[in-house]
């Protein structure tokens, strides 16, 4: 039996589609439905790994968690990871296909559309309700041919559509009306409701505008969701970076270097659970100052980002901070940057075949053609804590001094192993690892933060915060409550149950 479905599309990127879909998944799950998320094509540098080693968008992973489901590549069959201004690494069904520029990818869309349809139908057979997320805007009229992301996907799924607009940026009425005007007549009929997102102010003042909007587009406004702050992971390329900074009064000043090709910046999210941590996102050398901890995050183009660090002077600033007592922590691409040299003999990332790193760790990385994507379990060699995370990298890093290895890996994708990962500098103030999600591990993170506190002459904090998964579950429940309290759920369920009649499209 095919599932019911509801599709969330937006007037633009970053209007809140991913978060709204996450909340709807949680609502339907809490109401007793077998719910699954789906996004046919995601473009993001933040990804996650499924239990079988497949790579999917971080948003669909989060939506699966909210649905109490094991994340699967069926939830996001196509993932595009930009690695240049005009091209992306194309991942199909969780595995790297190849790098493609926009023109070649556009030619490939007809085949992908067929594949997406088959995968969606398989997921539909396993579900009561599927929450489908669109991408960008359905009004990108130059991309309508062979579309399988927005209205094209709604037609494949025969799904009613909810259109979301972001009022916080201004112009929400124009963006909604303009989007509806640019849709084809059969597509407009599929839009069954509108949600206004990120509202601040008086609802009574807004209310007349909602009525006028309904009169113009002949579609009901199902709800107005207030602007809120929950600690949920963001993956959008149009991320509001101002939200990245956190708790300016924290004892431990953490500076995160904003690399041009930064990826998997969700690694930083768990640090927001710690009251003694302050987080700053650093773009300019003069803003770095002298933090307790510098984090160099993941990168989709490590060599280009190392080149940026040198040209901007950020490399010298990081080295000066380390000389003055700062800890430095590199994750994945950031780990590669910490080393002596990064080699790319096959020009996978750029036309630069070799570049010097920060030389904070005596290591050499070579970019390979094969990609490692694993769920990983390990123990660290300094605190002896269990670590769970995931690896996504195309580099292999060799450490000259084996005694400086950071972690011992005991399983990858549930297969037992005995491998080493990462490195710790001789002064024990530089740490590097390939394992994303390392700060999700509360026991390790608290001990690591206490090491920084001790180095700065501060007392240790004994209390370990709650498990990060427990923390995320609470955030999903709060999100579901926000949706229930601000969206006409009775009307929404009617839309889901009515579906789309074959004659509507």
Swiss-Prot record:
Keywords: Cobalamin biosynthesis, Glutamine amidotransferase
Transmembrane segments: none
InterPro entries: Class_I_gatase-like (IPR029062), CobQ/CobB/MinD/ParA_Nub-bd_dom (IPR002586), CobQ_GATase1 (IPR033949), CobQ_N (IPR047045), CobQ_synth (IPR004459), GATase_3 (IPR011698), P-loop_NTPase (IPR027417)
SUPFAM superfamilies associated with the record: Class I glutamine amidotransferase-like (SSF52317), P-loop containing nucleoside triphosphate hydrolases (SSF52540)
Pathway noted in the entry: Cofactor biosynthesis; adenosylcobalamin biosynthesis
Domain GATase cobBQ-type: 251-444
GO biological process: cobalamin biosynthetic process
GO molecular function, one term: ABC-type vitamin B12 transporter activity
Active site (catalytic residues): 332, 436
Function (record text): Catalyzes amidations at positions B, D, E, and G on adenosylcobyrinic A,C-diamide. NH(2) groups are provided by glutamine, and one molecule of ATP is hydrogenolyzed for each amidation.
Similarity remark: Belongs to the CobB/CobQ family. CobQ subfamily.
Protein name stated in the entry: Cobyric acid synthase
Organism: Clostridium novyi (strain NT)
